[in-house]
Amino acid sequence: MKLRYSRVNKMLVAEVFDINKNKVSEIELNDAVFGAEVNDAVIYDVVRMQMASRRFGTAATKGRSDVSGGGKKPWRQKGTGRARSGTSRSPIWRGGGIVFGPVPRDYKYNVPKKVRKNALRSVLSLKYQGQKLVVLKDFPLDEIKTKKFKEVVDRFGLKKALFVTEERNEFLEKSSRNIAGIKMVRSEGLNVYDVLNHEHLVIIEPAVKKLEGALKS
């Protein structure tokens, strides 16, 4: 998509298209949100946090108290000439428990809200700078129709794209569900990993101002 930068008022300008790929207007983008300096470090921190949150952490081993059996003392304490032993499930025995093995755990952690906002501004700016940002005037769809949605995707030549809407739209969400490489999110659910994981970012115009309002400060 053709994008240009206006140096008169120091505002970023993007062209706005309808679903037939006709230019209908232009929109000024907030420089602090779509023209920010790209900070690779905060992007890395936030993506790492998101990936950690997706880990299940279900790996587990049995300690000496978890292994079945071993309740009977193998032999008497004294008089056999062998080392004393209280259970056959000791970690030093074959078939015994595991010492310091993995246990179920939660890998989730948080980074400061300010860092998350900074990372989101960085990836939005990255899409704008790389001319991978598409702004649609609207996406009129009054029924669940995957075919119609796919026609728009093909018209813009989108292979892997993230669509951002201002609010919940059942028709758009369900129509895009079975199209490979396409994902639909609401503006409040936009995240760094999804933006990076898709080649194009397609924003429905009303969602632009909502994003700017949430991220400009």
UniProtKB/Swiss-Prot annotation:
Instruction: Show the InterPro entries listed in the entry.
Output: Ribosomal_uL4 (IPR002136), Ribosomal_uL4-like (IPR013005), Ribosomal_uL4_dom_sf (IPR023574)
Which gene is this protein's source? rplD
Per UniProt, which keywords does this protein have?
A: Ribonucleoprotein, Ribosomal protein, RNA-binding, rRNA-binding
Instruction: Enumerate the Gene Ontology biological process terms.
Output: translation
Q: Which SUPFAM superfamilies match?
A: Ribosomal protein L4
What protein am I looking at? Large ribosomal subunit protein uL4
The record's note on quaternary structure and interaction partners says: Part of the 50S ribosomal subunit.
Question: PANTHER family in the record, alphabetically?
Answer: 50S RIBOSOMAL PROTEIN L4, LARGE RIBOSOMAL SUBUNIT PROTEIN UL4M
| Keyword rRNA-binding on entry | yes
Q: Gene3D superfamilies per the record? A: 3.40.1370.10
State a GO cellular component annotated for this protein. ribosome
Instruction: Show the NCBIfam families listed in the entry.
Output: rplD_bact
Give the taxonomic lineage as stored in the record. Bacteria, Pseudomonadati, Thermodesulfobacteriota, Syntrophia, Syntrophales
Pfam families (alphabetical): Ribosomal_L4 (PF00573)
Q: Say what the protein does.
A: One of the primary rRNA binding proteins, this protein initially binds near the 5'-end of the 23S rRNA. It is important during the early stages of 50S assembly. It makes multiple contacts with different domains of the 23S rRNA in the assembled 50S subunit and ribosome. Forms part of the polypeptide exit tunnel.
